[in-house]
A protein has these predicted regions:
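Conserved acidic residues
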Residues: 36, 58, 81
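Beta-strand-loop-alpha-helix segment that lines the small-molecule cofactor/substrate pocket
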Residues: 82, 88-141, 155
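A structured beta-alpha segment of the ubiquitous adenosine-cofactor-binding alpha/beta core
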Residues: 61-80
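Predominantly a Rossmann-like dinucleotide-binding segment in NAD(P)-dependent oxidoreductases
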Residues: 132, 139-232, 286, 386
């Protein structure tokens, strides 16, 4: 008999929200997870009304405090197995901390929180209470990101010399927040988004892609945070030169004022033997450039190890993971679903054994979240000193 689906409670995601919708589809993707409850707004009345108008029946709560407190009295099969936090950045820390203290696993939107101090407290809480925690860096959920990770970390490109990791958008090329557009309004508000707008919103994705694929850390930064739209309170253009932990260099860049760009996340990794290129807007394939050879394009579900580049020893688990034939497109929702699927496996193991160990190979961890905040805070300091080189703090 199959185990019952995991029950998921949602914090945030009410009227005007965006990211809750792909997240919710991802939760239901495999039939082994379901949304059963929600505290969908910081306004108690709005939270209850949003739950009543949800596309399917869920238990609505006036606040996340009430939802977390209610778990103690529920039968085991009705308790929440994990919480999904999809609020603006300023409202990540408190519900995450309260859930961890209550022994409820957390799947949190990025960035982790508002400050490095908050991030450090969350890291300590995860370790103290031994509760599963995942951070929603969507793009590492693409299968081609997993293949890229294997290629680079196996040394097939040689030693990494240079990485260009970027996320370019154009939707904030005008002062959209002045029109009352919800997503623009909170992302450009320092009280809700934190110290960096563009960097916190999408620059952290570019950083995570670099770290996930290469396994390298950023040691020093020379950052330039710029605001092109008059009257905007946070950066809308983010450029960071980086020294990497292996002695290589990188450029982590993000922009939200480049007209014509949609969600253009991409990474190019150049090593001593070749270069890998991948773009999230074309997530089904990656390209390998080798000296004096035709380019190699690898498509999901159409990869043949032992082809002269990928070794026969390419992990069978990696090769077997995609379920759709090549040409039937995977996309944004599939990437989210892969993250939730991997987190579900860890939650179930934790429930069965009491042990939780996240190695960072399947989804972003609490330590990745801390590193993202350390990166942002160091970039803010560097930019404030006209791009002066500054070292990131040591890992917590």
């Amino acid at each position: 008999m199959s185990p019952r689906p995991l029950n998921v409670g949602v914090i945030g995601g009410g009227k005007g929200a965006f990211i809750v919708h792909p997240q919710q589809r991802a939760i239901f993707f495999d039939g082994t997870r379901r949304v059963t409850a929600g505290a969908l707004s910081s306004n108690p009345q709005t939270a209850i009304e949003a739950a009543e108008n949800w596309p399917f029946p869920i238990q609505g709560y006036a606040s996340y405090d009430a939802m977390i407190a209610a778990q103690k009295a529920l039968p085991e099969d009705q308790k929440l197995d994990y919480l999904l936090i999809v609020t603006p950045n300023h409202a990540h820390f408190d519900p995450a901390m309260k859930a961890l203290k209550a022994g409820i696993p957390v799947f949190c939107e990025k960035p982790l929180c508002l400050t490095l101090k908050e991030a450090a407290e969350l890291v300590k809480a995860v370790r103290k209470y031994n509760v599963p925690f995942a951070l929603a860096h969507t793009y590492i959920g693409h299968w081609t990101s997993r293949l890229s990770r294997y290629i680079v970390r196996s040394g097939l490109l040689g030693d990494v010399r240079w990485v260009d990791s970027s996320y370019i958008q154009g939707w904030l090329a005008t002062k959209l927040e002045a029109t009352g557009q919800t997503q623009a309004a909170w992302r450009t508000n320092p009280k809700l988004a934190g110290g960096s707008g563009c960097g916190g919103d999408i620059g952290t994705h570019a950083l995570m892609q670099l770290r996930f694929v290469t396994g390298l850390d950023v040691k020093e930064v020379s950052a330039h945070l710029e605001t092109f739209v008059a009257g905007r309170k946070l950066d809308d253009h983010f450029t960071v030169y980086c020294n990497l932990s292996n002695g290589g260099n990188a450029l982590v860049r993000a922009s939200q004022i480049c007209i014509g760009h949609k969600n253009d996340l991409g990474i190019a990794i150049s090593g001593t033997l070749g270069t890998l290129r991948w773009r999230a807007e074309e997530p089904e394939c990656l390209t390998i450039h080798l000296p004096n050879q035709p380019d190699r394009v690898y498509w999901r579900s159409a990869v043949s190890p032992g082809d002269g580049f990928l070794p026969k020893e390419t992990p069978a688990e990696l090769m077997a993971e995609p379920t759709l034939p090549s040409g039937h497109t995977e996309g944004f929702h599939d990437a989210f679903a892969r993250l939730h699927r991997c987190f579900e496996a860890d939650v179930r193991q934790w429930q069965a054994t009491g042990k939780f160990v996240a190695d960072g190979s399947k989804y972003a961890t609490i330590e990745d979240g801390w590193m993202g905040m350390a990166f942002l805070e160091t970039c803010l300091k560097s930019s404030g000193k006209k791009g002066a080189w500054m070292a990131l703090p040591r890992k917590i």
